[in-house]
Amino acid sequence: MDMELSGRLKKLPPYLFADLRRVEAEARARGVKVIRIAIGDPDNPTPDPVVEELCRAVRDPADANRHRYGCDVPVEQFPQAVRNFCKRRYGVTLREDQVVTTSGSKDAIAQFALAVLNPGDLAIAPSPGYPTYNIGHVFAGAVTYQVPLLRSNGFLVDFDAIPLEVRRLAKVLWLNYPNNPTTAVADLDFFRRAVEFGRRNNILICHDNAYGENTYDGYQAPSILQVEGADEVAVEFFSLSKAFNMTGWRVGFLAGNASAVRGLRAVKDNSDNGTLRAIQFAAAKALDSYERIVPPINAVYQKRRDLVIDALNASGWNLEKPKATIYVWAPVPGKYRGSSAAFAADLLERTGVIVTPGLGYGQWGEGFFRISLTYPDDVLTEAMNRIVKTKG
């Protein structure tokens, strides 16, 4: 039987990264020697202290619950480590009811829409932006208003440019700084304006802080929760994936507004069974060891960032070095007339290099492409050698 899928799935565009994997498979089948530098999935292993804690916890004979549902017997050490981390890193004090453990950011973002949005509600998401914001809205039956992130404004949301009718109707506004895909960063004054915007318009500010710890040249990214009163109108999504090389582990947390946190916890109670206890113990170890673990990881990305930026600039791109994230965001060469899809397709056919076309992040991502730094130096070097040949 050919089952007809739900209408909500039919409303979704092809998922960007699934589409990239399909394109790669098709190219390899044609005999193309592919170099993929498109997806942000760390190539280096999870740090030893975290792995060792996982192994200890999963084998611990004293823990009779170690293989049981993570939701029924949660690890108290992880939310405590979260609160300690937020206090040490940001100076933010969180109550127990302001934190919930998640299976990474992606799951949490999609589930969160079910917690706070009703069919027909309006939600604001950035363009370009992480596709899962809009995907969550579709699952909840909500409608997305895309607010443009413009190069002329440093890829920051312009709150004043959001129409009054949108402000009146919207229930949530998504922010993401350091930003994927643009690599833009925001200062604490920007977050103060965001909190005031949320308070004035009765809009929940949802800040995706997935890249807040991937920073370079001494830069430290702020948290929206550092703003006085932010926990009244904002939540912040954290992930251990990129900061600790733990993408496959699927663990993170949501912090902030207690009622919104309670809403996500209710969705999770009814849709999943939590995170394996051993992973929670290991995640607590990661957060407790943040100061020792994260700097060496960032040093690798900073070196790769310099490698990529220097190579592109030597061939005429004129890019600034991003202060954060694990990406490089660049305009497509002029001969492609602003078409990121045309550039990405031609690059693959001519050189075998796969980058992410900016259009995949929304209409305002058009004209740009994204490179991920989660590939070995020699792979990035070879990819740059191939890319610069297309510049003319």
Give the location of each predicted region.
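Conserved core segment of the aminotransferase class I/II
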Residues: V227-Q302, D306-S315, T390-K391
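Helix C-cap/helix->beta junction micro-motif
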Residues: A27-R30, A140, R200-N201, S315, ...
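Conserved glycine-rich beta-strand-loop-beta hairpin in the small C-terminal domain of fold type I
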Residues: A284, A299-I309, L319-V332, G365
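N-terminal small-domain helix-loop-helix segment of the aminotransferase-like
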Residues: D2-G104, Q111, L287-S289, G392
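PLP-dependent enzyme catalytic core of the Aspartate aminotransferase-like
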Residues: N84, R88, R337, D346-T356, ...
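Active-site phosphate-binding strand-loop segment of PLP-dependent enzymes
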Residues: L150-Q220
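A short helix->loop->beta-strand "cap" motif at the edges of active sites that frequently abuts
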Residues: D121, A142, R200-I203, D231-E232
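PLP-dependent aminotransferase-like
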Residues: E96-D97, L114-L175, L188
